[in-house]
UniProtKB/Swiss-Prot annotation:
Modulates the activity of the EnvZ/OmpR two-component regulatory system, probably by directly modulating EnvZ enzymatic activity and increasing stability of phosphorylated OmpR. The keyword NADP does not apply. Belongs to the MzrA family. InterPro entries: Modulator_MzrA, SecD-TM. This is Modulator protein MzrA. Interacts with EnvZ. Keywords: Cell inner membrane, Cell membrane, Membrane, Transmembrane, Transmembrane helix. It comes from Musicola paradisiaca (strain Ech703) (Dickeya paradisiaca). The gene is mzrA. Residues 1-7 are cytoplasmic.
Length: 124
């Protein structure tokens, strides 16, 4: 009985030690290569097309899209791969001459490290 209780306690402590490690490893993967294109009208009050129009233009050129989200007076497009960022930006600039297209790529720093320090991590 004592031996069984010791084994249960050992397993419980081992799980408590491994849990933070698992959380750190999985949280660092949240900085996947998400590329976002932020579409903003060049003139205040100018109308932007709906998400379906943007989807059609990008799909015609074989550009994969994760999501298209309207936000305030702009549209945010999340792409499937970072390699398609430049092509998608060019397609949208030609399809939407009345809008500015800004490409944003996340830093390669994991989220947990960004939260620990507001200063960028530098070596050397």
């Amino acid at each position: 009985m004592i031996n069984r209780r010791m084994k249960t306690g050992f397993v419980f402590h081992l799980l408590l030690l491994l849990l933070p490690l698992v959380v750190l490893v999985t949280s660092s993967r949240r900085t996947a290569d998400d590329v976002t294109l932020h579409i903003i009208p060049q003139h205040q009050g100018a109308a932007l097309p709906d998400g379906f129009y943007i989807y059609q233009r990008l799909n015609e050129h074989g550009i994969g899209i994760k999501s298209i989200t309207p936000e305030d007076d702009s549209i945010i497009v999340r792409l499937s791969s970072p390699e398609q960022s430049r092509a998608a930006s060019e397609v949208l600039k030609s399809a939407l001459p009345q809008a500015s297209v800004i490409a944003r790529q996340p830093d390669a720093i994991p989220i947990w490290r960004q939260k620990l320090s507001q200063q960028p991590f530098k070596l050397g």
